[in-house]
């Protein structure tokens, strides 16, 4: 809240009750009375003050929420959208994709895909229903799901596959050869985010581009992923990685490595970062 009563709205990505406690007990006193336009200084102040416990998880989510509020406040004070403060528009429109298509009976899955197709979507992301504990039968069922969606959306549209950390390296290496024929744009989070060597190995296969970063919490974490060529698409969320201040730097870093950024979730803070990158 500014002296004149203008308010900035932030957003906590996960565990909002716990994040609020962290903000109230540790973070808010670091920024109260400060100039919001000193956002770089404020970000560094929060980061260094919580380094022992806050570099990932709740601490960084709290920093993200405050930083998003600061940028929203700056935009309102200057009467400009945040993307203009970041350098302005770089594109006329932001491409979007339909992101649901969870595991369900084949007919229902195809009806849902047809619905998105009729709504005008050209890109689709779907989920799997089975993992390592389900063995070869689970692999077969997963393939049937992908085939069902491809039958509806065709090969002129993009299809992305989301495993949501549900596999391990061994399982991923078994199923990927079965998925190649469906020409997916990417395979998202096949293994847990801590298995960076697994991401490196899968991405180096070159069979299907690997996407990740939804559960990464820092600029330095993405720097590590990019240096190791662990992913072909990065998917940060500004309300997890340190807000607009960190997200803008991650965009620049990804440009250096020529790796596309596809932010996680269609939330306003991610739209502004995408419009300015």
Regions found by a protein language model. Give the residues of each.
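Proline-centered loop/turn at the N-terminus of a beta-strand
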Residues: 81, 95, 158, 209, ...
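Conserved, mostly hydrophobic/aromatic
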Residues: 5, 27, 66, 79, ...
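Glycine- and other small-residue-rich loops at beta-strand/loop junctions that grip anionic moieties
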Residues: 12, 63, 101, 135-138, ...
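Glycine-rich, aromatic-flanked loop segments that form ligand/cofactor-binding clefts
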Residues: 67-103
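Metal- or metallocofactor-binding catalytic centers and their adjacent structured scaffolds
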Residues: 6-77
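Metal-dependent enolase-superfamily TIM-barrel catalytic cores that perform enediolate-based chemistry
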Residues: 93-205
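Shared catalytic-loop signature of beta/alpha-barrel
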Residues: 21, 25, 29, 177, ...
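Short beta-strand elements
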Residues: 1-3
């Amino acid at each position: 809240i500014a002296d004149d009563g203008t308010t900035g709205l932030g957003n906590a990505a996960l565990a909002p009750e716990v994040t609020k406690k962290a903000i109230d007990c540790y973070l808010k006193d670091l920024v109260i009375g400060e100039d919001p336009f000193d956002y770089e200084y404020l970000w560094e102040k929060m980061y260094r003050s919580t380094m022992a416990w806050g570099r990932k998880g709740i601490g960084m989510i709290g920093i993200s929420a405050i930083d998003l509020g600061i940028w929203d406040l700056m935009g309102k004070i200057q009467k400009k959208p945040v993307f203009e403060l970041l350098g302005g528009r770089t594109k006329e429109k932001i491409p979007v994709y339909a992101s649901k298509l969870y595991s369900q009976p084949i007919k229902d899955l195809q009806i849902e895909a047809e619905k998105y197709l009729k709504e005008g979507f050209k890109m689709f992301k779907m989920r799997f229903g089975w993992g390592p504990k389900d063995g070869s039968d689970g692999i077969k069922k997963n393939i049937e799901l992908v085939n069902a969606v491809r039958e509806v959306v065709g090969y002129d549209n993009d299809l992305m596959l989301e495993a949501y950390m549900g596999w391990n390296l061994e399982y991923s290496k078994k199923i990927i050869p079965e998925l190649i024929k469906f020409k997916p744009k990417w395979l998202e989070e096949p293994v847990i985010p801590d298995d960076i060597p697994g991401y490196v190995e899968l991405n180096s296969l070159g069979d299907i581009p690997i996407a990740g970063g939804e559960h990464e919490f820092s600029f330095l974490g993405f720097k590590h992923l990019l240096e190791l060529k662990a992913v072909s698409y990065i998917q940060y969320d500004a309300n997890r990685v340190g807000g607009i201040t960190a997200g803008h730097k991650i965009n620049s870093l990804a440009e250096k490595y020529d790796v596309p950024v596809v932010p996680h979730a269609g939330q306003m803070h991610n739209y502004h970062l995408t419009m300015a990158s």
